Amino acid sequence: MYANNGDCKLYYETFGDPKDPTLLLVNGLGSQCINYHEDWCGLFAAEGLQVVRFDNRDVGLSSSFEGAPLNADGAAYTLSDMADDGFAVLDAIGVDKAHVMGLSMGGMIVQQMAIEHPERVLTMTSVMSTTGEDMYRKSSRRALELMLEPAATDREAAIQQWVDGLNEWGTPEFADEARWRAAAARSFDRGGVLGGSARQYAAVMDSGSRADGLRALKVPTLVIHGDKDTIIDQIGGRRTAELVPHARFELIEGMGHDYPPQLWGRWVALVVGHIRANS
C-alpha cells in the first residue's frame, strides 16, 4: 500500500487490529521497512497495537530522489520533510494520533514529528539516536567510514557491505553472519531505491540541532540506547533524555547499533510499558 506526501510515494504495511492504538515504526539510514521483521511487528501487535512500518523516502519501494534539486547545503530534503512523510502514512490509514518509535535516523525523525506536531504524537520512543548537536554526534572512525561508503550495486558486494558494517557496530554477543547475510539478501532482492543513503545523510547533516524543540516537548518520551553502539555513542541518547522534560532513559548493556532477535522481547516490554504508562 502507498501513502502520498505531495509527489512522494511512501510504501507501508500494517499488522494487527486497526481498532487498536497505532504504533508507527520509523527506520534508520538506508534501512528498508522489512528490517522491522514481521515477527517483531507481531510481538507488538500481540500486545494490542496496530503496527505500521514503512519505507522512508529514498529507500526500498518509496520514491527515489535521485536527480532532485538540492538546497544551498546540498540536501534534496530535510528531516522535517521525512517527519511529514510519517504523518502522511498515518493520514493514509485514517489515524490522527499515534505512538511513534524510531531507530537511529528514525529516532531523529520521530523527534521532529513530536516537535512539529505534538498533538498527533501520543508517546515517542527514540532509539540509538541523538539530538543533532555536533558535540553529541560521536562515532568510531571505522563505523563512520563504513557507513559513508557508496552503496554497492552488485548483490554479493552489497551483502558483504552489510556484514562488514554489522561486524563493526552490531551487538557483539549476538553476532550472526548467517542471519546478517540472509537479511542483506532479502533487502537487496526486494529491489527499489539504491543509493538514497547519501541523500538521507545529507538531510540529517542539514537539519541541525533539535535541542530547543526537545526542551519544549511535553510528549511522553522513552529513550533507549546500547552501550556498545559505535555509530551513535550512548551520549547521544543520554543527551536526548536530558533535554526532554521527564524523559526516561534505558541503557541496554551489550547492545550495539542493531536489533538482534534475542533483544526483541526486552525491547517490546520497554516500549509497551511506556505506552501503557502514558495511556
What do these predicted regions represent?
Residues 59-101:
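Active-site loop/oxyanion-hole signature of alpha/beta-hydrolase fold enzymes
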Residues 247-279:
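Catalytic active-site module of serine/aspartate enzymes centered on a nucleophile-bearing elbow/loop
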